């Protein structure tokens, strides 16, 4: 018997059959229509990798099952006591047959979605908020969450056309921060921007327009205020109606004929400038 079979309070169950129904919540993670993290299907939240699983355990999303190799179980042994969920231990080959691809990170956790707060709730007490419109790429979305966590952004607000922050790829790219940084979805867009303004936020809209204020100028002017950084989709950027509702249009000075940066990179620069000023 391995000492990993008797971690206090952890229900370790060995699984050798990839068709075992206990593993159904991890099945076909790459399929278009059967993947368990589709909001229209099971709507599960899937954490992938030791660090992301650890962040799920620290979040409001409570896993109901974990699947991983013996090696990853060993790495998580100090995190799992008290977790009321079985750990299905399997070989890497069995895991690959279940999920549909070879999983280098060696461990998954599945949790059910929980009710989401409203915009007013997540911005209450916040100094810096990221507001996203049309950010429909999961990797960009995940990167923005990681940047937000690392650079002191208090919350994220989703406008229209954004990808699902709880999609497995978004959670993975965010390194689990999509599970920890508070977020809310606007129910009336872009009218909900007025809610932010009524709560004292200065709305800074990122745009490549040469007529906009520079990022350094805009952030310095708003140093003592609550700030909402508005970023739009790759390519089209923020919609005209959203730009009209902003307080200041903000650009990042560019060179060599480059008109703009990737949305996650642009957001990171804005977050950094805000943090650099100690706001």
Tell where the protein language model's regions lie, with residue ranges.
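Structured adenosyl-cofactor binding patch, chiefly the S-adenosyl-L-methionine
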Residues: 107-109, 147-151, 165-178, 240-279
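Glycine- and other small-residue-rich loops at beta-strand/loop junctions that grip anionic moieties
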Residues: 15, 45, 133-134, 159-160, ...
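Boundary-proximal intrinsically disordered activation/regulatory segments immediately upstream
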Residues: 1-75, 162-163
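RNA substrate-binding interface of SAM-dependent RNA methyltransferases
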Residues: 51, 87, 115-116, 120-211
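Short, aromatic/basic amphipathic alpha-helical patches
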Residues: 74-84, 241-242
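A glycine-rich helix N-cap at a beta->alpha junction
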Residues: 82-100, 184-187
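Active-site/ligand-binding-proximal alpha/beta "capping" segment
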Residues: 204-258
